[in-house]
């Protein structure tokens, strides 16, 4: 695994890559408030061992990438999609298989629409396209998730507590949640 910081337009994005750059690339885009490490290292290594070049990265306001004043993001979903293209450019990748989870899936869809020539395939996990005909999220889930904010990413206890609360909401009622 190799870490690389990509800098452009007063933005810096932290990336990590696995495997040979000449192999077909899979770009992994995680969701809101989730670091690239949610794409576990073992998962990335297994994909690279199958002949792929893997890139994972932290979106803005997450992990080692640029952060903004709390509650005042200075970017849009389209900017996040353009960030992904900047990542591909930094690795000199013309086209990639793009995998997006949650908000990463929204970013992936925007990439496919704005930059179709850069996309080999897309894979979407736990995401939506905001079509008004789709069923809506339960209001208590939306409310709970909107109230869970991490104000200090350097405070490990705050981060862990927030992710436990978030996971508790997302697990639903079918399974027992183990906080340990």
What does each model-identified segment do?
Residues 105-116, 122:
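Short glycine-enriched nucleophile-adjacent loop
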Residues 62-99:
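Active-site loop/oxyanion-hole signature of alpha/beta-hydrolase fold enzymes
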Residues 9-67:
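Conserved HGGG/HGGXW glycine-rich cap/lid loop of the alpha/beta-hydrolase fold
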Residues 25, 53, 94-97, 118-121:
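Structural signature of beta-strand start/N-cap positions in the alpha/beta core
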Residues 2-8:
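Short acidic-hydrophobic surface loop/beta-edge motif
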Residues 102:
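Catalytic nucleophile serine of serine hydrolases
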Residues 142-180:
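Alpha/beta-hydrolase
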Residues 120-154:
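Flexible "cap/lid" loop of the alpha/beta hydrolase fold
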């Amino acid at each position: 695994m190799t870490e690389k910081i990509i800098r452009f337009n007063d933005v810096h994005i932290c990336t990590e890559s696995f495997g040979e750059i000449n192999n077909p690339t899979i770009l992994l885009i995680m969701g809101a408030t989730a670091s690239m490490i949610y794409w576990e290292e073992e998962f990335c290594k297994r994909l690279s061992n199958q002949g792929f070049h893997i890139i994972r990265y932290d979106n803005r306001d997450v992990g080692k990438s640029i952060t903004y004043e709390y509650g005042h993001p200075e970017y849009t979903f389209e900017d996040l999609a353009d960030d992904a293209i900047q990542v591909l450019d930094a690795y000199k990748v013309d086209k990639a298989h793009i995998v997006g989870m949650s908000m990463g899936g929204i970013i992936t869809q925007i990439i496919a629409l704005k930059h179709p020539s850069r996309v080999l395939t897309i894979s979407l996990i736990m995401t939506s396209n905001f079509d008004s005909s789709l069923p809506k999220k339960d209001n208590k889930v939306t409310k709970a998730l909107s109230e869970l904010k991490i104000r200090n990413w350097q405070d490990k206890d705050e981060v862990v507590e927030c992710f436990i609360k978030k996971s508790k909401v997302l697990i639903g009622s079918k399974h027992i949640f183990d906080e340990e």
